């Protein structure tokens, strides 16, 4: 599927956090960049770390994302109708809490005195950096919502590169951010670790991908950490290695290390090239 100028898009995702998704995606991005014209997108906007692993120094602010909320002005006569209609308990003492307000506009509609008006509030930011290839990532402001909207804007900014390949570090879970990330990708890599919670969450992830007709492969990370029988087919396994936390702490990509994990990720890369 060719959209936004990117010929093929691969999303690296997981049913739960902490399984090594970003560690794998950063290494795959670097490996693919040696043979393909790529753009990397970090769509885990609640906790982006792609830029941290590549230690981006000169980041550029591409866009500020706003959401619409409401505030009460001096025309308020304190009738209380807005308090009754607000479903999010965002109005107290005739002031609207900007964190709780979802911007539905019910309060403005019911107010007979034009005492409630919309305002814009910063909800997130989109940045760009270059690490041998272009990297675009988003950051959701603390306490804000609208991660799906930010992800859509990240994708729109990627179109200018007309890349052969888009490597997307997606969010964990099966919520709105995940759906915004995978709904139009060509291939999803589902990262799972040998724990019951990871397996159960991966099953939910597979169900979501099937609903949206997204092709996927399952990659086991930390193989050997625990014995477990998977209820799905494993495409590739990456071994458990005690040195991985040290490598990450020192901002060393797994593919650049002299470890068994590095060799396994390179093997995964060679297998993935067959899908391009």
Swiss-Prot record:
Binding site for [4Fe-4S] cluster 1: 76, 79, 82, 111
Binding site for [4Fe-4S] cluster 2: 86, 101, 104, 107
Keyword vocabulary terms for this entry: 4Fe-4S, ATP-binding, Iron, Iron-sulfur, Metal-binding, Nucleotide-binding, Repeat
A GO MF term: ATP binding
Residues annotated as domain 4Fe-4S ferredoxin-type: 68-96, 92-121
Signal peptide coordinates: none
Binding positions (ATP): 15-22
Protein name according to UniProt: Uncharacterized protein MJ0578
Species this protein is from: Methanocaldococcus jannaschii (strain ATCC 43067 / DSM 2661 / JAL-1 / JCM 10045 / NBRC 100440) (Methanococcus jannaschii)
